[in-house]
């Protein structure tokens, strides 16, 4: 149950092992990954294929808010919290892309970086972030399935 793609118990949770932390994967994501951009967020993503059944989860994500864009730590932390919650509510879209139940998709892993690129004056509401993450994840699904 530790690294299952979608166990019924944790469908809408963001587990610790789903957070992208490996420096090598993060560096590769920014160097060779694709990106899509919205009004407030920019997503970098990269699909990797492993021939051996890996213990890492199908989708790993990281969230970042630049100190340059949002100088106050309290605001940065709030934005990251909102981004994590919006992703958590919409992440089920991505698991259809990396569904381990389909043999042609087994061994597929997706790394995603969600960056806040909005302004520092006014911050988007949770609902706006949720809609934008949903739209950007839909774009990822379309580009990766073709």
UniProtKB/Swiss-Prot annotation:
Keywords: Endonuclease, Hydrolase, Nuclease, RNA-binding, tRNA processing. Pfam families: Ribonuclease_P. It is an enzyme of class 3 (hydrolase). It catalyses: Endonucleolytic cleavage of RNA, removing 5'-extranucleotides from tRNA precursor. Its EC number is 3.1.26.5. One of its GO terms (biological process) is tRNA 5'-leader removal. One of its GO terms (molecular function) is ribonuclease P activity. HAMAP family: RNase_P. RNaseP catalyzes the removal of the 5'-leader sequence from pre-tRNA to produce the mature 5'-terminus. It can also cleave other RNA substrates such as 4.5S RNA. The protein component plays an auxiliary but essential role in vivo by binding to the 5'-leader sequence and broadening the substrate specificity of the ribozyme. Consists of a catalytic RNA component (M1 or rnpB) and a protein subunit. Belongs to the RnpA family. This is Ribonuclease P protein component. The gene is rnpA.
């Amino acid at each position: 149950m530790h690294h299952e793609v979608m166990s019924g118990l944790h469908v809408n949770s963001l587990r610790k092992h789903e957070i992208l932390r490996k420096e090598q994967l993060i560096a590769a994501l920014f160097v060779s990954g694709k990106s899509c951009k919205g009004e407030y967020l920019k997503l970098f993503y990269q699909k990797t294929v492993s021939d051996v059944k890996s213990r890492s989860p199908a989708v790993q994500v990281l969230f970042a808010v630049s100190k340059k864009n949002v100088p106050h730590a309290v605001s940065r932390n709030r934005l990251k919290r909102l981004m994590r919650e919006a992703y958590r509510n919409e992440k089920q879209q991505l698991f259809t892309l990396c569904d381990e139940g389909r043999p042609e998709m087994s061994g597929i892993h997706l790394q995603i970086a969600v960056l806040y690129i909005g302004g520092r004056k006014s911050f988007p509401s949770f609902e706006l972030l949720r809609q934008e993450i949903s739209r950007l994840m839909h774009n990822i699904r379309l580009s990766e399935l073709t």
